[in-house]
UniProtKB/Swiss-Prot annotation:
Source organism per UniProt: Helicobacter pylori (strain ATCC 700392 / 26695)
UniProt cross-references to PROSITE patterns, sorted A to Z: RIBOSOMAL_L20
Protein name: Large ribosomal subunit protein bL20
Single GO molecular function: structural constituent of ribosome
SUPFAM superfamilies linked: Ribosomal protein L20
Function: Binds directly to 23S ribosomal RNA and is necessary for the in vitro assembly process of the 50S ribosomal subunit. It is not involved in the protein synthesizing functions of that subunit.
């Protein structure tokens, strides 16, 4: 006896179309287009979760460097001085201090001044 895919197909299509909500035009309404777009969007999401980490680190480096240059030193010298002084502040915290609490960043810079 031949078995048709009625219920299984409907469930599979509903699952894909539910995930495709918010897509534009036929990419939301037509199963094949929605499935293709969904595969692409999942690929982009996976790739960009990795890229986000790189982009944030480079943003933190730029912010720390800008704050260091205001005090006549460079990012690389400052980071080396932090390592030598055994101060374990990460780039995220340092960038936040440079943006929101310049006084604290200046005090950190003064504490590593002898290691520069």
């Amino acid at each position: 006896m031949r078995v048709k895919t009625g219920v299984v197909r409907r469930r599979r299509h509903k699952k894909v179309l539910k995930l495709a909500r918010g897509f534009y035009s036929g990419r939301r309404k037509h199963f094949r287009k929605a499935k293709e777009q969904l595969e692409r969007s999942m690929y982009y999401a996976f790739r960009d979760r990795k890229q986000k980490k790189r982009e944030f680190r480079s943003l933190w480096v730029v912010r720390i460097n800008a704050a260091c240059r205001m005090h006549n030193t460079s990012y690389s010298r400052f980071m080396h001085a932090l390592k030598v002084a055994n101060i374990e502040l990460d780039r995220k915290v340092l960038a936040d201090m440079a943006m929101n609490d310049m006084q604290a960043f200046t005090s950190v810079l003064e504490s590593v001044k002898e290691h520069l």
